[in-house]
């Protein structure tokens, strides 16, 4: 399993069955978090994203819906067909990454390496949350900024070859400005991420215990 043909076949077969299985698709709602507004995206303690991801290599191309739930320690990514059937799920913690494809689960300590090993392509899941929220990392070289001083072109020097990141357009979501369209290129792979919805989240407080007086 080393190219996108595998996922294209999964997507096609899932689409054929989607009318029967869509009702059984799992909800992605993070029940322990509540929506909130922020002045800047970096203020969000957690967030959820819905959008579209397109992957292109010299051998193939693949387009999918993307759901991403991000906290300060964990990431949950789900790729689905246009009808909502899950193709692949990636769960990442500080110590382990788990990738589920159909009924098989694969694990590795490195999420990007796990994706590369199983699919032949990878997503920079460690740094992408920063780029999604319009920020840059310590390994990033800001090559160009726009008229508002926001990053426009960035080179990320993590790994053997750099990621070239283009912030093509911006939008306002949850009270904050963040990119609407990102393009990432490294060697012969190109990723395009379109952010349709981005919601800042805050942890829900534990409910107060019911007082004795209220029961009388």
From Swiss-Prot:
Superkingdom as given in the UniProt entry: Bacteria
**Per the record's keyword annotation, is Protein transport included, yes or no?**
yes
Instruction: Recite the UniProt keywords alphabetically.
Output: Cell outer membrane, Chaperone, Lipoprotein, Membrane, Palmitate, Protein transport, Signal, Transport
In this record, residues modified by a lipid of the kind S-diacylglycerol cysteine are 25
**One protein family per Pfam:** LolB
| Primary localisation category | membrane
Which cell locations does it reside in? Cell outer membrane
Asked whether the keyword Transport is assigned, the reply is yes
- Explain the purpose of this protein: Plays a critical role in the incorporation of lipoproteins in the outer membrane after they are released by the LolA protein.
What's the protein here called?
Answer: Outer-membrane lipoprotein LolB
């Amino acid at each position: 399993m080393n190219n996108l043909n595998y996922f294209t076949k999964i997507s096609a077969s899932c689409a054929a069955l989607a009318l029967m299985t869509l009702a059984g698709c799992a909800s992605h709602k993070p029940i322990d978090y509540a929506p909130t507004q922020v002045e800047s995206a970096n203020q969000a303690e957690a967030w959820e994203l819905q959008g579209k991801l397109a992957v292109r290599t010299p051998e193939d191309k693949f387009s999918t819906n993307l759901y991403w739930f991000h906290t300060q320690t964990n990431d949950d990514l789900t790729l689905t067909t246009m009808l909502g059937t899950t193709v692949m799920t990636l769960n990442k913690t500080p110590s382990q990454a788990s990738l589920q494809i159909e009924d098989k689960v694969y694990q590795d300590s490195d999420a990007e390496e796990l994706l590369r090993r199983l699919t032949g392509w990878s997503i920079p899941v460690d740094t992408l949350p920063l780029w999604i929220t319009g920020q840059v990392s310590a390994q990033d070289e800001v090559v160009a900024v726009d008229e508002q001083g926001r990053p426009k072109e960035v080179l990320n020097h993590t790994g053997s070859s750099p990621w070239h990141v283009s912030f093509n357009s911006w939008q306002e979501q949850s009270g904050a400005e963040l990119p609407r369209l990102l393009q990432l290129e490294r060697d012969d792979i190109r990723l395009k991420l379109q952010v349709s919805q981005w919601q800042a989240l805050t942890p829900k407080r534990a409910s107060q215990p019911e007082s004795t007086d209220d029961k009388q």
